Regions:
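Aromatic-rich beta-strand edge motifs centered on tyrosine
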Residues: 244-246, 450-452, 581
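Envelope-exposed proteins and targeting segments
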Residues: 49-51, 95, 113-115, 410, ...
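Assembly/oligomerization scaffold segments
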Residues: 1-134, 145, 154-335, 340-371, ...
Length: 601
């Protein structure tokens, strides 16, 4: 039998996040290879893919402590590794990932030495990374502010720190010796906010910008109709002035001053007891643009004259409870304002694919090695803070009702909810696996189970804002007993949660056969290795068992896991199959295998 020829490549001169590193072929030193990609059941996301490669180290070529070695100084953790297999002159990807380390083993009285590489895929690379503890801080800094006052200082300091430039200190016109610590004004900003009477910071003028913006969360604390709340920033030639005052109800007046640049407006807003997010931006081409809680407000231009700048540069706040006040030498766009607002509230309403893109963006992993569905059905809102990147990604995948895995070529992949029914390789048979005939063969032993152990007929979906929906299948509960499952999501609405519950109840509530992992290698024809090596997770196959008595067993299935073993002179491949997405039955229909429309929507 002509087994496939495995190859192992290592990028000794590359870095973990390089997209296209230069790989070096080390196949001649390989003693054994094992790879695993997949999951153990139908109800969990795919595991981190792994590989084990045993290298001959008798010459100490792969010993990180051998100072005369060819790769000395380059045998570091997280080097990229690629495993392929060639059959019929075609090289197929088997695994791409990263080396955990370089453990050297000596045996046979020191005459033999090996290095056993434990490897993991991209999910493993990101497994120790966390999403930001504070999204507001993360995104504010990403916009490169001139000044950034968080307002979370201790009152004993008497100073409000600028994260970028100058601290805010007690203004000379104030009789209040300090500021007051208050609860956070936004759900996703940790720490405290600051209530001030009058605080200011002056310093050497910055380069004169031709545009200015600022944003903050705030609550007006004006004690009466004569004391106005205001934020002021000018750099000597231009500036923004925000005044909040009472006249039967609260109003905001905005001005952008300096030269011919000016704008003003009055707009009513919520009572002072309610916090809100405010952003103001302007430039030479337009008047001031005002945003409240991420929404642009149409200003009514007033007749006030432009405020004139004064040296030195000054940032000042009076009579306000504020948090995360940031000032920019740019015109904030609507998207940027929404980013700051959503970061503070911990709510980003976006598709599951957009959320994964956001999460990957907090790491150094390249977006060019990502493939997220272009047709997501889920909109998520809530977002975690300080949680692991990978668990957060899997939570998004659960919200979509899709699958998250790393392909054999190293691409981080998210499928859409119904991709198991509609994607080309999941909807069309890629191989037939049977015990007779000319198709792919499997071993002499096979176990087929038919029970309710993996059936879920009581589905609970948790969603954003501590919401929860529950759906049950009374027919299967009556027939097989109740079996519950809880799915945590970040879905944005009860409607979305109900849609997911309907889908999951249809798939998880189906009574389907289960096949133990099967070995494809015994008696496999040489030409069939090209088919085996071409298989990928979630590919559709047909499984056939022909007993010596009675009818045959023939069912479609999707691949849940693929394991390869390469040793000199032998190759073994084992697959785990799932019939959950290929065998939906209408329980009260006499035609076994008839599709239930509600099963796949």
């Amino acid at each position: 039998m002509a087994y496939p020829s495995p190859k192992v490549y290592i990028a000794f001169n590359g870095l973990p996040y390089d997209v296209s590193p230069t790989f070096v072929d080390v196949t001649s030193y390989v003693r054994a290879i094992n790879t695993h990609r997949g999951r153990t059941d139908d109800f969990t996301q795919f595991d981190i893919g792994t590989a084990t490669v045993i290298l001959d180290n008798r010459t100490r070529l792969f010993d990180p402590f051998y100072t005369s070695g060819t790769y000395y100084g380059k045998l570091t953790p997280r080097l990229q590794i690629k495993i392929t297999a060639t059959s019929a002159a075609v090289e197929y990807d088997v695994f791409r990932g990263f080396v955990s380390g370089w453990p050297v083993t000596w045996s046979e009285a020191g005459k033999d030495s090996t290095v056993t590489l434990q490897c993991f895929d991209a999910l493993g690379l990101m497994a120790n990374e966390q999403v930001p503890n504070d999204w507001s801080d993360y995104y504010t800094r990403s916009l490169a502010p001139l000044r950034f006052y968080r307002g979370n200082d201790s009152r004993t300091t008497g100073t409000i720190r600028d994260q970028i430039y100058d601290n805010l200190s007690l203004s000379t016109v104030s009789t209040n010796p300090t500021f007051f610590e208050q609860p956070s004004l936004a759900a996703n900003i940790p720490g405290t906010s600051a209530t001030v009477i009058s605080y200011a910071a002056t310093g050497t003028a910055q380069a004169s910008p031709d545009r200015l913006s600022f944003a903050c969360f705030m609550r007006a604390v004006t004690p009466n109709t004569t004391d106005d709340v205001y934020f002021n920033y000018d750099n000597g030639t231009s500036g923004i002035f925000i005044q909040i005052y009472q006249d039967g109800q609260y109003y905001i007046e905005t001005k952008f001053s300096g030269g011919s640049r000016q704008g003003g407006g009055y707009i009513g807003f919520a009572p002072s007891s309610q916090s809100f997010h405010m952003a103001v931006s302007g430039n030479t081409a337009t008047n001031v643009v005002l945003y409240i809680n991420g929404q642009q407000i149409t200003n009514t231009t007033n007749s006030s004259s432009a405020r004139t700048g004064s040296n030195p540069e000054k940032a000042e706040v009076q009579f306000a409870n504020f948090q995360d006040w940031s000032i920019y030498n740019l015109t904030l766009s609507s998207a940027q304002v929404n980013l700051l607002y959503n970061a503070g509230t911990g709510r980003f309403s976006e598709t599951s694919s957009a959320r994964l893109t956001r999460l990957v963006g907090t790491t150094s992993f390249s977006s060019s090695l990502c493939s997220f569905t272009a047709s997501p059905v889920a909109t998520v809102s809530e977002i975690g803070s300080g949680t692991g990147v990978v668990p957060e990604m899997q939570l998004v995948a659960d919200s979509e009702g899709g699958n998250l895995y790393v392909s054999k070529s190293g691409v981080l992949t998210l499928t859409a909810r119904r991709a198991v029914f509609t994607d080309t390789r999941s909807a069309n048979v890629q191989a037939t696996i049977q015990d007779t005939g000319s198709a792919l063969k499997y071993g002499t032993e096979v176990e087929i189970s038919y029970d309710a152990d993996n059936l879920k007929n009581d589905v609970t979906i948790n969603f954003t804002g501590d919401g929860q929906v529950v759906q049950t299948n009374t027919t299967t509960i009556a027939g097989f007993g109740a079996s519950s499952t809880l799915i945590e999501t970040q879905l944005n609405s009860p409607t979305s949660a109900n849609d997911l519950a309907t889908y999951e109840l249809g798939t998880q509530g189906a009574l389907v056969p289960r096949i133990q992992p099967i070995d494809l290698s015994p008696n496999t024809a040489d030409a069939d290795w090209t088919t085996i090596l071409g298989l990928e997770l979630l590919d559709r196959v047909t499984f056939i068992r022909t007993p010596s008595v009675g009818n045959s067993f023939s069912r479609a299935a999707l691949i849940n896991a693929i394991d390869h073993t390469f040793i000199p002179g032998q190759t073994q491949t084992q697959v785990s199959l799932s019939m959950r997405y290929t065998s939906p039955l209408i329980l009260d229909d006499s035609v076994r295998g008839k599709y239930d429309f509600n099963y796949y929507g």
